Structures are given as C-alpha cells and as structure tokens.
Amino acid sequence: MAEASAAGADSGAAVAAHRFFCHFCKGEVSPKLPEYICPRCESGFIEEVTDDSSFLGGGGSRIDNTTTTHFAELWGHLDHTMFFQDFRPFLSSSPLDQDNRANERGHQTHTDFWGARPPRLPLGRRYRSRGSSRPDRSPAIEGILQHIFAGFFANSAIPGSPHPFSWSGMLHSNPGDYAWGQTGLDAIVTQLLGQLENTGPPPADKEKITSLPTVTVTQEQVDMGLECPVCKEDYTVEEEVRQLPCNHFFHSSCIVPWLELHDTCPVCRKSLNGEDSTRQSQSTEASASNRFSNDSQLHDRWTF
C-alpha cells in the first residue's frame, strides 16, 4: 500500500514538472488534474510545452499535418464569441475578466449546457509562424466554419434552457449572403458591376443620327451665351451645329459619338424619338438588380 502511494506521488510530481500552454488564455497554466483543463477559463484546449514549441519563442516555423493539428488551426481562425455568445466569460482574451465574470455568474450556465465538464478539444501539437501574435484569419475557412455551425445550431435548443442556441439571433440573415473578407466583397462588387453594365439606353439608329438637322448659330444665341453642353465651348456666329428633336444644340463632333453609344440627349435624357429614357433606365436597372439577386442565390458559395 505504501509502495502504491509512493508511486502515485512520483507520478503526480512528474506531471507537475510538465509545462502546459492554454490557447484561450494565451499563456502558461497549471492544469487541473486529472481532467487536464485550464484553471482560468475551464477549457480543455491546452497542450504540453516542449523545447521546440513555436508559440513561446522566435525562429522558424514547422507544420504538422495531423488531423488534430488541422482542427486546432481551424479553431484558432474562428471567432468563438460570434457563435458562443453565452460563453463570453470562458472565451474572453483576458484571464482576469474570465475569472471575474465566472465568479459573478457562477458555474450554473457552464453545467446547464455542457454538464459537469467543459467541452474538450482534441489535444495536439499546434504550430504557426513564429513572431506572429495570432494566425491570419482566412475568409474561406471562416465562411466554411460558419456554414457548419449554422447547420448545427439551426434547430438545436436545450429543453428548459433559458438560452437556446439560435442562428437567427447571431446573424441578421442567411450566412451565405454575407461577404466573408475582402475577397468576398470584391466578388460581389464585380458581379454587381457586371450586371449593371450596358443597362443604359441602346445606341441610336444611324439613319436618325445622319438625319439630324444642321443649323447655324445666330447672333442672338451668342449674346445669350449659348455653348455646347458636351465640350462647354461657346458658339460663334454662323457656326454650324447639330440640333436634336429636344431643341438642344451640339457640335457634330461632340454629339455623334455619344449618340452612337446612347440614344439619349446628354442634357434632358430624351431619345431621338422624343421619349423620356429615364424611366426606361430605371426599369432596366431594377431588372438587373433582380437578376443579380437571383444569381446570388444560385451562386456556389463554396467556390474559392
């Protein structure tokens, strides 16, 4: 019996001699035994510190291709408080705040959701580039994880719990409609510009352009300060200009290239037929907006 006690004491001393690092608290801790959980945040996301642990010193970097390492990297990219808002005391980056909030709320919330022990994450070596305070957040990885959690929490609620998980309370719409990072935002803007391209009035008919009357500028018009609306140059007496059906005057070299692209007056937006092209443009833009919305719903959000 005495020998067993001595052996247990030696084992405890050996464990105590080991150093452990908590990835939630971002510091060394002495884990609670035998569960191996952090005494500050009550999480199991800790690992043993070795001489080559990359998160404690500077130098090169190493990569571990094990499954547990991949999960640890994904978990590190994830903004935990976005999903577990009721567990902010346990996921806060400040150990003092964690201790204070945990004392105020007690362990009732903790035990209601997870039982007597907190959720344990797979323990494995976790490496990232040394000299960096935290890993770079990947929009693609974060989007995938949020989709996974969206499906997991969609219909989950703990009976009798005052805080059932609800994805609708975390985001204001479908997570797939969000732009994850700068890349996602650029893709949306590019698609929107593509939908709105060529939504203005179509080119004017060439016969109508050539049939526009050519008139000469009078002294009265010069005295009124009449100018070309395109180049803003003042007209001179007896200068030849082109007159549109809306009675606006332009230099031929200014208005013809415009009409070859848009059947509309640059001043009043009326077409050569005398119709108001503003309403046509609005209806075309609305149609393009609806097309963009439908395409967004059918877009494969897992392509990156």
UniProtKB/Swiss-Prot annotation:
Q: Does the keyword Transferase apply?
A: yes
Q: Which Pfam families would you find in this protein's record?
A: zf-RING_2 (PF13639)
UniProt tissue specificity: Expressed at extremely low levels in normal breast, prostate, lung, colon. Higher levels of expression are detected in heart, skeletal muscle, testis as well as in breast and prostate cancer cells.
Q: GO biological process annotations for this chain's record?
A: negative regulation of epidermal growth factor receptor signaling pathway; negative regulation of toll-like receptor signaling pathway; protein autoubiquitination; protein K11-linked ubiquitination; protein K48-linked ubiquitination; protein K63-linked ubiquitination; protein ubiquitination; ubiquitin-dependent protein catabolic process via the multivesicular body sorting pathway
Gene Ontology CC terms, in alphabetical order:
cytoplasm; cytosol; endoplasmic reticulum; Golgi apparatus; nucleus
Question: Which residue stretches are annotated zinc finger (RING-type)?
Answer: 228-269
| Comp. bias intervals (Basic and acidic residues) | 98-110
Q: What is this protein called?
A: E3 ubiquitin-protein ligase RNF115
Organism, by scientific name, is Homo sapiens
Tell me the lineage of the source organism: Eukaryota, Metazoa, Chordata, Craniata, Vertebrata
